[in-house]
């Protein structure tokens, strides 16, 4: 793994790596796996395709892809401890010949231009300073005609759903994570404001414009759980 200078996101996720998959399920009302599966189901992969999974974390998306397609997957993440947990999961499924995990940042991908047939990223843009530049970098390593896909948290627009979302993120999640661990309580306090701020700065139409400006017109946007999560996917111009 290539060492990188520790960032806020790396420090945040290092603190929850051992129990990430379990509590990611609990805190999303057991939607975490369903969202991931829907994301992967939108991929139009062909035999032998090379996929880049950015913010791979514990390699959940990478393993989901490997379970449905015979291509090779490179997972990249800033957190070494998340990657170590992911590597154990990869080896447990005997997929280390097809899934490679490396440490790095989405803003400076260590790959040549037009390397990958598909690039997918999850919960990424809230942690980068310049979403536009990050999408440009992701597009750089994507082959013309290749797919870019993303999964991110959202803020529901329906008033009563938004009210429940606010109660959960402002009160319930910070309190329920206290007995779990210091790392998870930190996440419980951080996540709601982080999502709210990002959705104000980069609503879906703004994200679509960023994709378009970087040669990837989104062909679809799908809200999940009344807008608590959003999947986007599009194809890079040839």
Language-model features, listed with the residues they occupy:
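A short acidic, Gly/Pro-enriched loop at the edge of an enzyme's catalytic core
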Residues: 107-118
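A short SAM/SAH-binding and catalytic strip from SAM-dependent methyltransferases
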Residues: 118-130
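Conserved beta-strand signature within the Rossmann-like core of class I S-adenosyl-L-methionine
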Residues: 146-153
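Conserved class I S-adenosyl-L-methionine
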Residues: 1-44, 60-64, 85, 188-193
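A short glycine-rich, Lys/Arg-flanked "PGG" loop and its adjoining helix->strand segment in the class I
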Residues: 132-144
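C-terminal alpha-helical "lid/dimerization" subdomain adjacent to the S-adenosyl-L-methionine
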Residues: 7, 78, 155-210, 214, ...
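Class I SAM-dependent methyltransferase SAM/SAH-binding core
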Residues: 50-108
């Amino acid at each position: 793994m290539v060492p990188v200078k520790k960032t806020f996101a790396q420090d945040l996720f290092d603190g929850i790596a051992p129990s990430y998959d379990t509590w990611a399920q609990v805190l999303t009302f057991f939607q975490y796996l369903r969202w991931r599966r829907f994301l992967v189901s939108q991929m139009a992969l062909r035999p032998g395709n090379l996929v880049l999974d950015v913010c791979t974390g514990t390699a959940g998306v990478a393993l989901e892809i490997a379970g449905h397609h015979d291509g090779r997957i490179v997972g990249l993440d800033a957190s070494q401890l998340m990657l170590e947990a992911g590597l154990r999961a990869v080896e447990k499924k005997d997929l280390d010949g097809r899934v490679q995990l490396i440490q790095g940042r989405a803003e400076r991908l260590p790959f040549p231009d037009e390397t990958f047939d598909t690039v997918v990223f999850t919960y990424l843009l809230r942690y980068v300073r310049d979403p536009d530049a990050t999408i440009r970098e992701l597009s750089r390593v994507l082959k013309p005609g290749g797919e870019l896909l993303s999964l991110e948290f959202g803020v529901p627009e329906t008033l009563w759903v938004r009210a429940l979302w606010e109660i959960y993120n402002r009160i319930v999640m910070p309190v329920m994570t206290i007995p779990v661990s210091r790392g998870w309580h930190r996440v419980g306090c951080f996540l709601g404001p982080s999502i709210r701020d990002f959705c104000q700065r980069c609503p879906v139409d703004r994200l679509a414009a960023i994709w378009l400006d970087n040669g990837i017109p989104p062909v679809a946007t799908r809200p999940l759980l009344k807008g608590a999560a959003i999947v986007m996917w599009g194809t890079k111009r040839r």
